[in-house]
C-alpha cells in the first residue's frame, strides 16, 4: 500500500510530524513501513509555461519553434520535438539552469540553427514512471487540462505535488483496514491522539428519481450481501484535474478519465471498490447479480475473452454479463468519451467467491484484493456518495435522487468484554480501567464499564478484532511496546519428561532405524486416483477445495502410494536396495459431502525391496522376503511390549499377493497388514519384488503395554528336544506354537521354528514344520525322563488337535 504524505493531511493534522517520524511510529506499533519514496527525483526550477506561438522549424521536419510565456518580462524561444505541442497550451517548462532527474542540467542551446532557451517537459522527464503517465501523454509533452486554472511562472513541481513523500506499507493479512487512506488516518489518529476529518459526501440531488432508470436484484444474498446503483446524468468525460491525477500516480495507478479516476480515487480513499457503467451501453434498466452459467462467454475491460464457470459471480443486465463481480468490468459497458449517463455500482461481495472468481479468471485487481480480505460493509453507501460528489464536482454530473438497492446484510454489533486483570497480566502492565478506556477512545472504539470489565464495541472497519486478546494487542500497541516493563519469567523449574506416547514414538523410530530402514517423508496431499487406491469401500477420499494441482488435490488415505513413488524414483536411478519407513497422518471419512472434520489417524508404513543385508567381503547376501518383513514387525511389537497381544492371520487384499498377505490383529482387532505387492501391480508401477507393511500407530500406542518382568540367569541346566510335524498346508505355524505352549506347561521354556519343508517326498497338500523345544525346571535339575514325558504330552496334544504326524 502506497500512502501519500500530502494526501494524508486531508484527513488528519500531521504537518508538524515528518514522514520519517510517522514511519518510525507506525513500524514500532506493528505496521511496518518498508520504504519512504520521494516523488521528486531531483527536478528543480520547472514552471508553468503558456505556448503563445508554434512555428515549424525551417530546417527540421519533426521540430517546432515555440514562443513560450513563463511569467517573465519576455517570452522565451524553445525548440520542441513533441508531436502534440500546439499554441494555446499550458505546459511544464524547465528553465535554463534547471535540473531534471538523472542529473540533466538545462542549458541554452542551438538546434539546427534555432536558439532554444529551456525545455518543454513530458511527465517521464520529470521522473514519473511511464506506466503511470496518462496514455494521451506517453509519447509527448504533458498539457494541463483546460479546466485547470494555472498561470505562467507558477511552480509546476508544486502543481504536480512532486514535493511529496510516499510511504510504502507492508501490511499483514489481518490489517486490511489500512489498505486505504482513511484506514491509515484512523491508525495515525489513534497513535497521535488526533481527530479525523472525513471527506465531503453531500450530493446535490435533483427531483428526478433513479427508480425510473435502473432496478437491482441479486440471486443469492450470501454471495452479494449489498448492492447499490446510483444514476448520474449529463457527465462530461475528460481528463481529471492535476490534483486527482497526481494522487493516483503517487499511489501507483494510471489516470484514465475523470469518472474512472474518481472510482479509483474512492477505492484508495475508502477501500471500497466501485465500478462505473455506461448506462446506454448496458441496454437495460435491470441489473441482476448471479452465478455465471457453465461455459458462459465474457470479455473483460482488458480485452480478454473469458469462459466462465458457475463458481464465478457476474453482474448482468438481466441477459448477459457486464462485469465479473468484484474483479473487473466488461468491455462493452465501459465508460468512454461518448458516455453521458453513468450507473455507479457500489457493492459488497463475499470474499471467498471473489477470490475463487479471480483465481479461475487468472486475474487479480486492486478491487479483488480488497474484496478478498473483506470490506467495511457499513461504509459502502458513504463511499458511493463520495464518488457521486466528486463526479458532480469535476465532471458536471447530475445525480438522480435515490438509489436502486438490494440489501441482505446481517447487522450485528461486536461487543468484547475486556478483563483488566487478565490484560495487565498478559502484557505486563498495571493500567487502570480509565487509562484503557482512554486508549479505546483514541481508537474510536466505544466502550463502557460493566462491573470490573470494560465492554468494548468494535467498529465494522476493524474486522481483525474478534477476541479479548486482540484488544490486549491494541492496548500494547498504543501504550507503546517500548514502554512495556521488562520482567524475568517467574515459575518453579521442573524436570521435563516425555509423555508415554512420545516415548513410544521414539522407541519405535529408533528400532526401525536400527533395523536398517531409512525414514521417508511425503506430502499429505495426493491425487484422487492414489487416494482411492487403498481406501476401504466405505472410505470417501476428501477433496481439497482449491488445490494447487491435480497431484495435490486429495487428502491421503494411505501412506503406501507415495512410498511406491519413492521406491520407483530410486530404482530408476539404479538404487536397487530400498528399505524405507514413514510415519504420518491419513485422513478418513465415510461422508460423500463433508459436514464434519475427517478422522486423522497416525500410521506407520514400511517398504522393502532388493537386498536386505549384504556382506560382500564374505560373499553373503540376503534378499528381502515376506519373513524379513514379518520379522521386522515382530521386533517392533516386542519393542513396544505388545508381542503377546499380536496375531498374524492370512488375508486377501486387492493389489497384493494372495498367498503372502497377512492381517495384523491386536487383541482380535485388525490394526493393519503386511504383504508382498502383487506381481501385476509391481509391473504396472515399475517395481521389483516389493514387500510392504502398514499399521495404525494410534491403536498401537493406545494398547496397554505388557510390563517388563525381570528373570534371573537360570541356575539349572536345560534339555532340548526337536520335533518335525507333517501337517496340512492350511495349518499355520502360529496355531501349532500356541498348542505347544499351552500343552508344555511350566517346564517348557521356549519354542522356535528351525525348518519348514514342502516338496519332494512330501505328500500333496502337506508340509513339514520342525520345532526346537527347550525344557527347564526353575528350582532343580530337570531329569531326562521328566523332559521326555512333557515332550510326549505335547506331541499327543498337537496330534489330537491338528491331526499332525511326526516326521520320521
From Swiss-Prot:
Name the reaction it catalyses. tRNA(Phe) + L-phenylalanine + ATP = L-phenylalanyl-tRNA(Phe) + AMP + diphosphate + H(+)
Q: Where in the cell is it found?
A: Cytoplasm
Q: Where is the B5 domain?
A: 411-486
Q: How is the cofactor bound?
A: Binds 2 magnesium ions per tetramer.
What Gene Ontology molecular-function terms does this entry list? ATP binding; catalytic activity, acting on a protein; magnesium ion binding; phenylalanine-tRNA ligase activity; transferase activity; tRNA binding
Q: DNA repair: is it a keyword of this entry?
A: no
PROSITE patterns from the UniProt entry: B5, FDX_ACB, TRBD
Q: Where is the tRNA-binding domain?
A: 40-157
Query: Could you tell me which residue ranges the FDX-ACB domain spans?
Result: 714-807
Determine the domain of life of the protein's source: Bacteria
Q: Which residues bind Mg(2+)?
A: 464, 470, 473-474
Q: What is its main location?
A: cytoplasm
Give GO BP annotations, semicolon-separated: phenylalanyl-tRNA aminoacylation
Q: Which cofactor does it need?
A: Mg(2+)
Q: Which UniProt keywords apply?
A: Aminoacyl-tRNA synthetase, ATP-binding, Cytoplasm, Ligase, Magnesium, Metal-binding, Nucleotide-binding, Protein biosynthesis, RNA-binding, tRNA-binding
**EC id:** 6.1.1.20
**Key word DNA-binding present in the record?**
no
Which Pfam families is this protein grouped with? B3_4 (PF03483), B5 (PF03484), FDX-ACB (PF03147), tRNA_bind (PF01588), tRNA_synthFbeta (PF17759)
Q: Which SUPFAM superfamilies match?
A: Anticodon-binding domain of PheRS, Class II aaRS and biotin synthetases, Nucleic acid-binding proteins, PheT/TilS domain, Putative DNA-binding domain
Family that this chain belongs to: Belongs to the phenylalanyl-tRNA synthetase beta subunit family. Type 1 subfamily.
Q: What interactions and quaternary structure are annotated?
A: Tetramer of two alpha and two beta subunits.
PANTHER family found in the cross-reference section? PHENYLALANINE--TRNA LIGASE BETA SUBUNIT, PHENYLALANYL-TRNA SYNTHETASE BETA CHAIN AND LEUCINE-RICH REPEAT-CONTAINING PROTEIN 47
Designated name of the protein: Phenylalanine--tRNA ligase beta subunit
